[in-house]
Curated annotation (Swiss-Prot):
Gene: mtxX
Disulfide-linked positions: none
GO process annotations (BP): methylation
Classification via InterPro entries: MeTrfase_MtxX_xsu
Gene Ontology molecular function terms on file: methyltransferase activity
Similarity-based family: Belongs to the MtxX family.
Enzyme Commission number(s) of this protein: 2.1.1.-
Protein name: Putative methyltransferase mtx subunit X
Length: 280
C-alpha cells in the first residue's frame, strides 16, 4: 500500500490532466494548494468561482468566472472541457445534487482515500452521511470500491465494521443489528470473490490487516474520516465518486489544502483513459 501513493503521483505527472476546482470564499491557503499542484506537475488547474474574489488574493491559475461553482463544475465535467473535477471549497449539497442531475444519477457512491498519522494509506466507505444505510448499499460500495481499487494496482482487503464486539450481543437492539449486518456483508463479499472479514467494532485491528474499511453507516464513516484527517494527525486525499465515464473527487472544505486531491483526480483521469483504450 505504501507504493500506492507513489503510483498515484507518477500517473498524475504522466497525465497532467485539466482539473477543475470549485472555489467559494477563497483564501491564500486554498489558492496556494491549487497552485502547488500545478507547479508540481500534477495537473493544469482551473479555478471555478467568483473571479473578483479570487483576484483580490491573486493567482496565475486559469479562472472560470461564476457565482455558482456548484453547477458549473458539473457542466465543465459533462462537456469534457476538463478531464476531472474536485469539489474544493464549493458547497457539498449543491455540488453533489448538480452532479447527480447532470449525470442522471439517483445516488452517488464515494470512496475516501486517507492516511493515518503514521502515513498508512487506506480506503474508507461510506463517508456521506446519507450513504451506506442498508445492506444493499454497503455491498454495492464494496463491489464498486473493490473494482476501482484494483484499477490502482492494489488487491482490496475489506475490513467490515459494526457497533460492538460479538460478546456485546443482547445489550442493545441496534448494536445487535449492526453485528448481524457486519457478519452478513463480510460473508456475502467473500462469496463474490472479495477478500473480506468482519472486525466488529475493532477498527484498530481492521486497519492492521485491511486496506478498505467499511463503516457501519455513513455517519460513523464521516466521523472516522474527520477524526483521522482533522484531529488524529492523518490526512484525507479526497473521496472519488465511483463512476466509469467521469472523474469527480469530493473534498472537505475544513482542511484547506487540496494539492493531493488534485493529484488523485489527475491520476484517476489517466486510469480512465487507459481503461477506455483497453475496452476499445
Amino acid at each position: 500500500m505504501y507504493a500506492l501513493l507513489e503510483a498515484i503521483e507518477a500517473r498524475a505527472r504522466m497525465n497532467r490532466a485539466r482539473v477543475a476546482m470549485g472555489i467559494r470564499d477563497p483564501n491564500p491557503k486554498t489558492l496556494e494548494s491549487a497552485w502547488r499542484a500545478q507547479v508540481l506537475g500534477y495537473a493544469q488547474v482551473v479555478l471555478v468561482g467568483d473571479k473578483k474574489e479570487i483576484d483580490r488574493i491573486g493567482t496565475d491559475l486559469e479562472v472560470v468566472d461564476t457565482k455558482d461553482p456548484e453547477k458549473v463544475l458539473s457542466e465543465l465535467l459533462v462537456s469534457r472541457k476538463v478531464d476531472a473535477a474536485i469539489r474544493g471549497t464549493a458547497k457539498a449539497s449543491g455540488t453533489l445534487s448538480n452532479l447527480k442531475e447532470a449525470l442522471g444519477m439517483k445516488r452517488v457512491c464515494r470512496l475516501a482515500l486517507l492516511l493515518t498519522a503514521d502515513e498508512t494509506p487506506f480506503f474508507l466507505a461510506p463517508v456521506g452521511i446519507d450513504e451506506g444505510n442498508t445492506i444493499a448499499d454497503k455491498l454495492r460500495m464494496i463491489i464498486l470500491g473493490a473494482e476501482h481499487i484494483r484499477r490502482l494496482g492494489v488487491e482490496p482487503v475489506v475490513g467490515v465494521l459494526s457497533g460492538g464486539r460479538i460478546g456485546d450481543l443482547g445489550r442493545d437492539r441496534r448494536v445487535d443489528r449492526t453485528l448481524a449486518d457486519g457478519e452478513f456483508v463480510a460473508a456475502r463479499a467473500l462469496g463474490l470473490g472479495i477478500n473480506a472479514k468482519h472486525y466488529t467494532i475493532l477498527i484498530e485491528d481492521a486497519i492492521k490487516e485491511s486496506n478498505f474499511i467499511v463503516a457501519p453507516d455513513g455517519i460513523s464513516g464521516n466521523l472516522i474520516f474527520r477524526t483521522i484527517a482533522f484531529l488524529g494527525g492523518g490526512d484525507g486525499l479526497g473521496a472519488p465518486v465511483l463512476m466509469d465515464d467521469y472523474v469527480f473527487v469530493d473534498t472537505s472544505r475544513v482542511g484547506g489544502h487540496f494539492t493531493k486531491a488534485i493529484m488523485l483526480a489527475s491520476a484517476l483521469s489517466y486510469l480512465h483513459k487507459e481503461r477506455k483504450k483497453v475496452i476499445r
